[in-house]
From Swiss-Prot:
Pathway: Amino-acid biosynthesis; beta-alanine biosynthesis
Family affiliation: Belongs to the carbon-nitrogen hydrolase superfamily. BUP family.
Transmembrane annotation, as ranges: none
Modified residues (Phosphoserine): S378
Gene transcribed to yield this protein: UPB1
EC id: 3.5.1.6
Enzyme kind, highest EC tier: hydrolase
Originating species: Pongo abelii (Sumatran orangutan)
Name the record gives this protein: Beta-ureidopropionase
Quaternary data: Homodimer, homotetramer, homooctamer; can also form higher homooligomers.
Keywords, comma-separated and alphabetical: Cytoplasm, Hydrolase, Phosphoprotein
Chief localization: cytoplasm
Reaction catalyzed: 3-(carbamoylamino)propanoate + H2O + 2 H(+) = beta-alanine + NH4(+) + CO2; 3-(carbamoylamino)-2-methylpropanoate + H2O + 2 H(+) = (R)-3-amino-2-methylpropanoate + NH4(+) + CO2
Domain CN hydrolase: 72-344
Amino acid sequence: MAGAEWKSLEECLEKHLPLPDLQEVKRVLYGKELRKLDLPREAFEAASREDFELQGYAFEAAEEQLRRPRIVHVGLVQNRIPLPANAPVAEQVSALHRRIKAIVEVAAMCGVNIICFQEAWTMPFAFCTREKLPWTEFAESAEDGPTTRFCQKLAKNHDMVVVSPILERDSEHGDVLWNTAVVISNSGAVLGKTRKNHIPRVGDFNESTYYMEGNLGHPVFQTQFGRIAVNICYGRHHPLNWLMYSINGAEIIFNPSATIGALSESLWSIEARNAAIANHCFTCAINRVGTEHFPNEFTSGDGKKAHQDFGYFYGSSYVAAPDGSRTPGLSRSQDGLLVAKLDLNLCQQVNDVWNFKMTGRYEMYARELAEAVKSNYSPTIVKE
C-alpha cells in the first residue's frame, strides 16, 4: 500500500496491538521510549489552524560532572505543494514561502534552534518529467536568491539556523544547476552551502537530466547550537556518505528528501536510524507529502505506461539518536513539524560505550579502497 490510505505506522500499531505487545514492538522498532515535549498550547492551536501536525520529543543523556548538557532543539518540516504543479512559477514559490513561514512561526513558539526543510522545497519534485521549462525556472542563487533572502529574514527574526534545500543556479560557473542546501546562521548570514553527492538513476528519478553529483565534498557547519551537516536524499543509501560527515565532526546530520512509497518506504525507517548508530550522531530524516501531478505524461524507460505523477510521497519524517532510539514518524499524509530536544552530550557518551570510531579500522579500508578503484584491481577471492 503505497498511497495515503493510512496515516502512519504508529497509528496502525496502536490501533491493532494490545498495550503490552505494543510496548515491546516499539522497544524493538524505536529503542528506548522518549519523553514527549510539553509544547506550548498556542503552538498546537496555531498548527491546528494552519492544518499541520505538530509533535515533540526529547532525547536525554546521562548527567555528567564536568560537562553541562548541550541542549539544542531541532525542527523538521514536511509538506505538500500548496498549488497545482501547473500554476505559474512565481505563484508556486510565493505560496510555498507563505506555507513555510507559518510553520516556522510555530517552530519559534516551540523554541526551535535549527530548522530544516525538505529537498527542493520551493518547487514540485518535477525532475521525473525530464522537461526543462518551466522547472528550471525554479532555480535560484544559493547566495542571494529570493528564497535565501526569505530564509535570512526568518533566521534573524527567530534566532534560528535555517537549512534550505533548493534547486541552485550557479551563475558564477556557467549557469550550472545543482541540488543544494543553503545553511543560514541564526544571525541571518549565509554560513555556506552543500550539494547532493549522489544522484539517482532509478525509476522516475531522472535527476541527472538537470544536475550532476555535487563537488563540495562533505562540509560540516559550526553553528551556535552545534555542528551540523546535510546529506541530501539519495545520499542516505550510501554509508560512506554519512561516515564522511561524521568524520568531519557532524553532531547532527539532516537528510532532506523526496522519496516515494513504491520505491523506498520499506527502507525509510531503517537507514537514518542505522546511520545515527554507526556514526555516533543524531540524524534527521525529512520527506515531502502527497502526490504531485504534472501537465504532460512522461516515461522513464522502465516499461511502465506513460503517467503524469511521480508517485506518493509518504512523509514519515523522524529523528534518530546515536543510541538507536528514535521518534515516531510524522504522518504519511499531512504536513507536519517535528520538534526534537537533543542533548549533544549523548554523541560522546555512546561513542565511549560502543567505540565504533576507535574500532573502525579506517586505515585498512582506506588502503583497500584505494586499490579497489584502480582500473587493474583484482578482487581478493580465495579459490580451491
